[in-house]
């Protein structure tokens, strides 16, 4: 074949690439503008692609094309646990998840041999070569329970369909040890092909779509916890001796602070309730009154004690700390809304760890 234009379509068909991409590789130039002596066309191809290319080389008697063995991380369960495990690039470097967090431990150290050579006969006689033995990468053992993870993945996938949701996340934690037993985000991706599937995600650029696909929302995203935070407020009041089971709270449907009227979820109000009943009814007004009793300094103190506003130490990359308003900057409106779960933000792992404390 006289030109890359003639050869490119044949190679492209064999390995499943675009002809223009193959030709660009064949026409690779050095910085000086001269033709490059060699270029890597594609890495980590499947066996069938390699066989196709070898057959083409043999049939067309092509020279200068080398199909060489390479290493590739293989994930036998596909997308299972993908946001936790993460994935690697073509050089085996971690991109996301545990692969990124523990890249240096998993990679090991390659061996080396240093020796003197000459062009005709190879090594010089009587010279001493220096050897450095390779060091295997270490194993990383996860707390994930495979059976619980499988069930959680199935539930999340079904919820995505049943509720026509944009995304579903599931987190399961052992309340006694804090160990994470399952962590699921749907939709997910296949770490064997970590760049495939970005068309299912929204973004202005492919890079933005890719980051959304890889994003472990349970660790990387924060949210206003809402009513689930009322447990933290209730425990704070109990620990400080500011409330008893016989204390009563009156809810008429809203309370006004300054110019802002803040409503309970039940527009007609819950009437007079005990401490236990404001928890049972998830009454916003009752928890606003409880927040006033606690005060900003004490509430922030307990928020920090429960681990909010700081990383949980989950050992996954990019954990978001969340935003916790300082007591000195807190208005009365901030105080009462924080008491029932608004204003501050947390991540899912933080909340689960706090709830299980």
PLM segments and residue spans:
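Soluble periplasmic/extracytoplasmic beta-strand elements of cell-envelope proteins
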Residues: 40-44, 66-68, 83-87, 141-143, ...
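Small/polar-residue-rich segments within soluble enzyme cores
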Residues: 2-13, 24-137
